[in-house]
Amino acid sequence: MDTPTLEKIVVAALEDIKARDIEVIDTSKNTPLFDRIVIASAESGRQTRALAQNVHDKVKEAGGEIIGTEGQDTGEWVLVDLGSIVVHVMQPAVRAHYKLEELWNTPLASRRAATR
């Protein structure tokens, strides 16, 4: 599945369960490992796990491949590896602490809010 199609599926799956502050970062020029990072916030461990599960389910339904999922035990930060896209679903305090957007050192102009 191509990256733009996969991105749309991921964003729609996150929006379905009311993820907040969904952000897509193009990492294709920063690393050969994946093309995009999608970061979203959830209000609770239960919502974090539900969002990650919905991404997993929707990608699988569309014929996509799930490489792996990490962090579902605590639900503070759940990562879903889809190969060309890595999805991070985080509770707000964890997101503020790790600042992945800054870690990838992308200026605000090259980041964009996710759209379906």
Question: Where are the language model's segments positioned?
Answer:
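Active-site beta-strand termini and strand-to-loop segments that position acidic
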Residues: 80-82
